[in-house]
Amino acid sequence: FVBQHLCGSHLVEALYLVCGERGFFYTPKSGIVDQCCTSICSLYQLENYCN
């Protein structure tokens, strides 16, 4: 996994891969779009959104 811009369905797919069965907490207000779409985010940042 390389740090990258993740937007829309790509962001959701990445969360499914990272979080697996734990699932994830996704709301536009959580800042994940700013962190991962506007900016570049890492695997570790994505894990912060797992349940």
Curated annotation (Swiss-Prot):
Function: Insulin decreases blood glucose concentration. It increases cell permeability to monosaccharides, amino acids and fatty acids. It accelerates glycolysis, the pentose phosphate cycle, and glycogen synthesis in liver.
Localization annotation: Secreted
Sorted UniProt keywords: Carbohydrate metabolism, Disulfide bond, Glucose metabolism, Hormone, Secreted
Gene3D superfamilies linked to this entry: Insulin-like
Subcellular location, principal: secreted
Gene: INS
Family to which this protein belongs: Belongs to the insulin family.
PROSITE patterns, per database record: INSULIN
Designated name of the protein: Insulin
Matching CDD domains: IlGF_insulin_like
Disulfide pattern: C7-C37, C19-C50, C36-C41
Subunit structure: Heterodimer of a B chain and an A chain linked by two disulfide bonds.
Any one of the GO CC terms: extracellular space
Alphabetized InterPro entries for the sequence: Insulin, Insulin-like, Insulin-like_sf, Insulin_CS, Insulin_family
